[in-house]
Amino acid sequence: VRGGGHSWPGLSVADGGLMIDLALQNSVTVDPARQRASAQGGALLGHLDSATLPQGLVTTAGVVSHTGVGGFTLGGGFGRLNRKFGLAVDNLVAADIVTADGQFRTVSAEQEPDLFWALRGGGGNFGVATRFEFQLHPFDRNVLSGMIVWPVEQAREVLDFYAGWYTGLSDDLYVGPVMLTMPDGTSVIAMEVV
């Protein structure tokens, strides 16, 4: 199943296999009163953000706007807001799927809870997800981000500091270590701060 097509080329499709492409099913609707968003199986994270942000609402999303909502969510969904709001899968409140027997099912904690539980932890192994419904959260502030960079030789010292310091941070702050190779070929360790 191709949602956003963000996977490494060739890793998601078997030679001679069949691909179900959901790219044209990419609409997102927002219900501000219920603080819910509904995204079709081919929607991208950029579509989701574009629909929710003008309403002052967010859910956990990734850092690359052309990632598919489906693959991101069914893979757990780690993003910069996960400390505050949980993983994307934690914010999934319902999904529409077509199972291998051809049945269309809407699953949630109240409706087919076992299948919903499996979907939230087992990825796309239980059917083709055609719609995702997310809990949204008010978010009306400006965000500032940047990177702090050190030579890679200081990686152990930086990571030791990070490990002891990170657990006491506010859930409003995202800090993530990244190893990078700079354009001149030098390696660095960086902390992304949002």
List where the protein language model places each region.
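C-terminal cap/substrate-recognition region of VAO/PCMH-type FAD-linked oxidoreductases
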Residues: 95-96, 100-194
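A generic structural signal for beta-strand entry/edge sites
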Residues: 17, 34-38, 186-190
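N-terminal glycine-rich flavin-associated loop
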Residues: 1, 22-65, 75-109, 138-160
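Flexible loop/turn segments at secondary-structure boundaries
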Residues: 7-9, 46-47, 67-69, 136-137, ...
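Short glycine-biased active-site loop of nucleotidyltransferases that positions the nucleotide triphosphate
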Residues: 8-14, 30, 120
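Structural motif
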Residues: 17-19, 36-37, 57-60, 71-72, ...
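Aromatic- and acidic-residue-enriched segments that line the glycan-binding/catalytic groove
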Residues: 10-23, 75, 81, 124
